[in-house]
Design a protein with these regions (language model features):
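A structural signal for short hydrophobic beta-strand segments in well-ordered beta-sheet cores
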Residues: 25, 143-146, 197, 209
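Hydrophobic packing residues within well-ordered alpha-helices of enzyme cores
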Residues: 14, 60-64, 228
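Histidine-centered beta-alpha loop that forms part of the nucleotide-sugar donor binding/catalytic region
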Residues: 8, 54, 133-134
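Conserved N-terminal catalytic core of the sugar/cofactor nucleotidyltransferase
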Residues: 2-5, 27, 31-105, 109, ...
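Conserved donor-nucleotide/metal-binding helix-loop-beta segment in metal-dependent transferases, i.e.
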Residues: 113-139
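Catalytic-core segments of class I nucleotidyltransferases/pyrophosphorylases
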Residues: 100-102, 109, 118-122, 136, ...
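N-proximal low-complexity "stem/linker" segments adjacent to membrane-targeting elements
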Residues: 1-18, 25
Length: 239
């Protein structure tokens, strides 16, 4: 299995900290957030990592290089325009070379047993497994409805309040089979939550949900970043 970390976001809500660095380079626990992800993947046995870049694209490669000092091989994709999540991932089709991929949103911090997630994915046999958690404000996330076998029946990105039927939503870590690339067109920009997951369900592809029970935080604002920094030493194995 290979890994792709999506890191192209502008990080405008983290200004002024992101004036000179991408948001994945903001420090938590004395290290850039992205370093925590890379070290975790290396510990879990992942050696090939793809990273997409847009905002201040020189910063990440100048720090991580080819990844050798972290025990991995890093492959960079430099985007000339900012893309949605699925289109950003599509750029790694040749890198994946037919292998399964774990995909991580670079601005999340979480606790996760990757081997258990992959075992779950293998047992279910779907095209994709989406990590899930409960959200206080599900209207800001992609929410899901599942059956008793954890198969996803419905995925709704950022629903209106009257459309909310559950607070269980997307936690930003996926495992994809390589054939998922076939469902991401190149004619325009595509997002996983708004476009690809609903499309897969319409075409009767099996998506499964894996519930996270440990720590998870979306570091999208200065307030959440400060919380992550305070929480870091209170939890084990945060990445």
């Amino acid at each position: 299995m290979k890994a792709v970390i999506l890191c192209a976001g502008l990080g405008t809500r983290l200004l002024p900290l992101t004036k000179d660095i991408p948001k994945v380079m903001v420090e938590i626990g004395g290290k850039p957030l992205l370093q925590h992800h890379i070290e975790w993947l290396a510990k879990e046995g992942i050696r090939e990592i793809g990273i997409n870049l847009f905002y201040l694209p020189e910063v990440v490669p100048s720090y991580f290089g080819n990844g050798s000092k972290f025990g991995v091989n890093i492959h960079y994709s430099h985007q000339s325009t900012l893309s949605e999540t699925a289109s950003g991932f599509k750029r790694f089709e040749k890198f994946a070379d037919g292998e399964r991929c774990v995909v991580i949103y670079g601005d999340n911090i979480f606790q996760l047993d990757l081997k258990d997630l992959e075992l779950f994915h293998e047992k279910k046999g779907g095209i994709a497994t989406i990590t899930l958690r409960e959200w206080e404000n599900p209207t800001a996330k992609g929410i899901v409805e599942m059956d008793n076998n954890y198969r996803i029946l419905k995925f709704k990105e950022k629903p209106k309040a009257e459309e909310v039927t559950t607070n269980l939503g997307n936690a930003g870590v996926y495992i994809f089979e390589s054939k998922l690339f076939d469902y991401i067109p190149t004619d325009k920009d595509y997002d996983f939550g708004k476009d690809i997951f609903p499309k897969l369900l319409e075409e009767n592809q099996n998506l499964y949900g894996y519930r996270l029970h440990g720590y998870h935080l979306d570091i999208g604002t200065l307030e959440m970043l400060e919380k992550a920094r305070k929480d870091f030493n209170q939890y084990e194995d945060l990445v």
